[in-house]
A protein has these predicted regions:
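Acidic, glycine-rich A-domain
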Residues: 3-181
Length: 181
């Protein structure tokens, strides 16, 4: 799973993200499915931060939980770069179904030219590239305007808009169950 560190004036949103990742990690561990948890944020092209909170070969233990608890709101959303990095990681997995579940708070953007159409198109190309490698990208967003641009990026069935961040902990396992059927 790839999540974008939310930038929000409400500290509560990041708390919901932490809780969601902790509960989702516990649920995935109970299924026996192999999974990784990663995060990202960016400040221009030269500074994309990709954080590996739990790798596929690591246990979901107190160290992984501690890394999740240490998550802080980040900067910008250079989503195409993060998807490409996650694709490289997922390509090495031999699972029958490789799912890239993305949590985001809004449109791809950054301080440079990545804002606007360029960021949208770069992200769309990264999604097409991921699919060409047999990866199934799915985006969950709390951006209420997500329905206006996410179909272009992920297709009509490749995303979900969550209007209330509090719904995230309960809905993540449902999305995962749908994606793994």
């Amino acid at each position: 799973m790839l999540f974008r560190s939310w930038v929000s004036s409400e500290a509560r949103v990041i708390d919901v993200i932490r809780d969601s990742l902790l509960l989702f990690g516990e649920a995935l561990m109970a299924t026996g499915d192999r999974f990784a948890l990663c995060g990202f944020s960016s400040v221009k092209r030269s500074n994309v931060r990709f954080h590996r909170l739990k790798d596929f070969d690591q246990r979901f233990d107190d160290r992984a939980r501690g890394r999740i608890m240490a998550i802080k709101p980040g900067y910008y959303t250079r989503l195409g770069a993060a998807i490409r990095h996650a694709t490289t990681i997922l390509e090495k997995q031999t699972a029958a179904r490789r799912i890239l579940l993305i949590l985001s708070d809004g449109k791809p953007n950054d301080l440079d030219l990545y804002d606007g159409r360029y960021g949208i198109e770069d992200t769309r190309v990264a999604i097409v590239e991921a699919r060409s490698h047999g990866i199934v990208p799915f985006c969950v967003t709390i951006d209420r305007e997500g329905a206006s641009y996410l179909p272009h990026l992920f297709g009509p069935a490749g995303f979900a808009v969550i209007r209330q961040p509090d719904e995230l902990p309960a809905r993540l396992p449902m999305f995962y169950a749908q994606l793994t059927r």
